Amino acid sequence: MFARFTFRTCRPAGQAIRKYASEASPKPSSNVPLYGGLALAAGGAYYYWQRQQSPQALEAALKERSKVFIGGDQGWVDLKLAGIETLSHNVKRFRFEFPDSESVSGLHIASALLTKYKGPKDEKPTIRPYTPVSEEEQPGYLDLVVKQYPNGPMSTHLHNMAVGQQLSFKGPIPKYPWEQNKHDHICMIAGGTGITPMYQIIRKIFNNPNDKTKVTLVFGNITEEDILLKKELDILENTYPRRFRAFYLLDKPPAGWTQGTGYVTKELLKTVLPEPKTENIKIFVCGPPGMYKAVSGPKNSPKDQGELTGLLKELGYDKDQVYKF
């Protein structure tokens, strides 16, 4: 991934893409058209019901539900694996059920959970953060989408788990605090499973009829089948073509691929992102270490964003305009 780059788009190129990047977000009166489409895609009555509620009514309803994860000194919570869905040759969706089917996760936007596993021969437990892809207000369970890495002890353990086994969780781990209309335009540069915290924010925006934030996504993967959550992203892009645009990059594109290949480059970012001087924008970055190094520079620690370097610095963005997950 991110080895070479040529950007060939089937959409109107050049000036049309630049226009999208620079124009203000339209102000539609409602997100209702999305609700039905996503409800059908999800196949759940609750999924549809909760989108018909006003944000205030939904918030009040959620306050009445018990939360599985409350942070602080709560400690680890063991959840049972209830289902496994194979998404590709090395990616699976794992559903973990809550002890109480009416409880919700207690996560907020944007936040993650820690997972813990200690094998019989391990001296120390393996602890890794994951961002659930299920709704924060979904009662009864949470879903993780996990790619198995050859030398990844937690991802390998998850892929070897059987239904009925348990995994320890802890959280929520706060990331970027999101509020509706906090920014006029957000831009997301993601690689591989780095899409999961991005999708958490994207979903929150388009589930809220009062949030008019515009979203641009640049998403790199190795192959087309590695593009996680593509179905959900397509629904959003088709429903909100003036508020959500996704640009995909593949290291190994199939025949007939019409979008980008290889590296995220300065040329691409200059074309699809709003100019640095644009007011009230935010750029989010999440992906493998090589992508951080090239695009934004790495974080110093989970709580220290580090200095802004790489392509975004070269293009003139400042540190306050960028957040690294």
From Swiss-Prot:
Any Pfam family the entry gives: FAD_binding_6
* Listed GO CC annotations: mitochondrial outer membrane
The chemistry this enzyme catalyses reads: 2 Fe(III)-[cytochrome b5] + NADH = 2 Fe(II)-[cytochrome b5] + NAD(+) + H(+)
The protein's matches in CDD domains, at most eight in alphabetical order, are given as: cyt_b5_reduct_like
**A single GO BP:** ergosterol biosynthetic process
* UniProt cross-references to PANTHER family, sorted A to Z: NADH-CYTOCHROME B5 REDUCTASE, NADH-CYTOCHROME B5 REDUCTASE 2
What name has this protein been given in UniProt?
A: NADH-cytochrome b5 reductase 2
The organism's taxonomy opens as: Eukaryota, Fungi, Dikarya, Ascomycota, Pezizomycotina
